[in-house]
Structures are given as C-alpha cells and as structure tokens.
C-alpha cells in the first residue's frame, strides 16, 4: 500500500514525524510532501499567484513552498509516479473539531486527497498548556492510530467522503475507546489584537480566546472531553438539502432537488 502524508504545521513539525511513524506501521511505501513553513489556518487554499518551489529532503520526502492543498496536488500529480492508496493529513498540533474544520489546513489535506479520488483521513491531537508551554501528547495518537486506521481503511466510503480523527488530551491508557461523532458547536471567540511597531505603525494578530461549547452527546467536542477518540465522517457536498424546498418556494417554483 502506498501512503502520501502531508500536514499544515510544516515539514519539520513533531506531528508529521508522529504521522510517519504511524504510517510505517501500515506500509513501507510512505511518501511525504509537506509545506516548507507553517500553513495553519489556510484551509483549502491554492497558490495561484506565485510558483511552487519543491525541495527534496530525502528519498520520498519533500518540502513544498505552498499550502497543504498544493502539497497533495503536487504529491499525486507530480512527485509520485503511481497514485497513492491513502492520504493521511496531520497529525495536527491541536484538535480540529466543530466549526474549526472550515479553517483547518489539516482538514484541507484530506479534502484535496478526496477530490483527487484517494481515500483520505485527517488526524489531530488535542493538547493543553502547562506553565505557558504547549504540551502535545503525541504518544496518544501514536499508540491508538495504527489499529484504528487498519479498521477504517477497509471501509467502503461514498465518493466525496473522508474521515476526521481527533485524539483526546490524556494518557494513552486513559483513552476510552473511539466514537463516531458529528460536528459540535463552539462559540466564535476570534479576537483582533492591535499593536504598533517600532515606528508607530499599526499591525494586528488574530487569536482565539476561551471558547465555550455545548458539549452535546454524540459530538466531536463531547467525545474529546470524555477521553474518547472522535471519528467524524465529513463530505465535500456542502448543500443543505433540508432547506432546498423552502428556498424554491421563496423563489416561486418547485424544488429542483
């Protein structure tokens, strides 16, 4: 089995190293095309206004000056001579749950793999802060992902569907199994931090504050809160079929879907 790995935290990220170790428990034909620099929050964006610079690090291991989406396209269309059987994107430093999936470059890697006709999974590891330092328990995903992926790889998923896997912030022996979930809802608490540079010119940082959520049973955020691995099937089709009739009636004609 041929596996293509990518991420959004960059080619030198600890999560990518963890993902490679996970992938090598499944296959010895593992390829990496990952961003040269951190591409977090760029979602499913393409580089259309500047060239893509590809750098070979070692055999089957490449860094690309581009987005996660660029990386998957280059991996499948340029770097690899034979299409991969599986695309794994991650392991992200931090969970990708609820509405955050729309921002995530990690999710985008799996989206692009799916669009290219390859079975794709996104993997993310929840973390905590201790004394101001980010502590990411990579051992959780490394312990539990291989067996989980072996089970999920044989699934007959519909076209346009991929899986979003989130691992809880706890010790490996505290993980309480895996749960199939739906997207939860977190309060939108994105803030703008206004600052001034040395010459008095303004600049800004975006940052997330504390985010409350309704930890409803069956959601991804509820699963993580209870030390469960969250497995959420996501799909490319964003159509809201529940309102097509109402929209059609508002326009004065029958539903078309």
From Swiss-Prot:
| Cell compartment(s), UniProt | Cytoplasm
Catalysed reaction, written as an equation = a ribonucleoside 5'-phosphate + H2O = a ribonucleoside + phosphate
Main localization, broad class: cytoplasm
- Superkingdom to which the source organism belongs: Bacteria
Q: What does the cofactor section's free text say about binding?
A: Binds 1 divalent metal cation per subunit.
Enzyme Commission number: 3.1.3.5
State the UniProt keywords alphabetically: Cytoplasm, Hydrolase, Metal-binding, Nucleotide-binding
Checking SUPFAM superfamilies in the record gives: SurE-like (SSF64167)
Do you know which InterPro entries this protein is assigned to? SurE, SurE-like_Pase/nucleotidase, SurE-like_sf
Q: Name one GO cellular component term.
A: cytoplasm
> Which cofactors does the annotated protein need, by name?
a divalent metal cation
Q: Which Gene3D superfamilies match?
A: Survival protein SurE-like phosphatase/nucleotidase
> What family does the entry list?
Belongs to the SurE nucleotidase family.
Functional summary from the UniProt entry? Nucleotidase that shows phosphatase activity on nucleoside 5'-monophosphates.
Q: What is this protein called?
A: 5'-nucleotidase SurE
Protein's organism? Rhizobium etli (strain ATCC 51251 / DSM 11541 / JCM 21823 / NBRC 15573 / CFN 42)
């Amino acid at each position: 089995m041929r596996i293509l790995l990518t991420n959004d935290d960059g080619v030198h990220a600890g999560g990518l190293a963890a993902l490679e170790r996970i992938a090598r428990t499944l296959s010895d034909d593992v390829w990496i095309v990952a961003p040269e620099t951190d591409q977090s929050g760029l979602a499913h964006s393409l580089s259309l206004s500047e060239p893509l610079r590809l750098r070979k690090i070692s055999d089957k291991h490449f860094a690309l000056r581009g987005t996660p989406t660029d990386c998957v396209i280059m991996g499948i269309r340029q770097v690899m001579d034979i299409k991969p059987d599986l695309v794994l994107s991650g392991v992200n430093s931090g969970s990708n749950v609820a509405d955050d999936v729309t921002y995530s470059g990690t999710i985008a890697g799996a989206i692009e793999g799916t669009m290219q006709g390859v079975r794709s999974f996104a993997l993310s590891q929840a973390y905590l802060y201790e004394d101001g330092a980010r502590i990411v328990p990579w051992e959780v995903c490394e312990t539990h992902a291989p067996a989980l992926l072996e089970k999920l790889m044989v699934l007959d998923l519909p076209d346009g569907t991929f899986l979003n896997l989130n691992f809880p912030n706890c010790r490996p022996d505290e993980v309480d199994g895996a749960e199939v979930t739906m997207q939860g809802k977190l309060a939108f608490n994105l803030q703008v931090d206004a600052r001034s540079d040395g010459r008095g010119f303004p600049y800004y940082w975006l940052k997330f504050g504390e985010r409350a959520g309704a930890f409803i049973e069956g959601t991804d955020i509820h699963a993580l809160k209870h030390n469960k691995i969250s497995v959420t099937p996501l799909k490319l089709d964003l159509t809201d079929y529940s309102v097509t009739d109402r929209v059609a009636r508002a326009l004065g004609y029958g539903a078309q879907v």
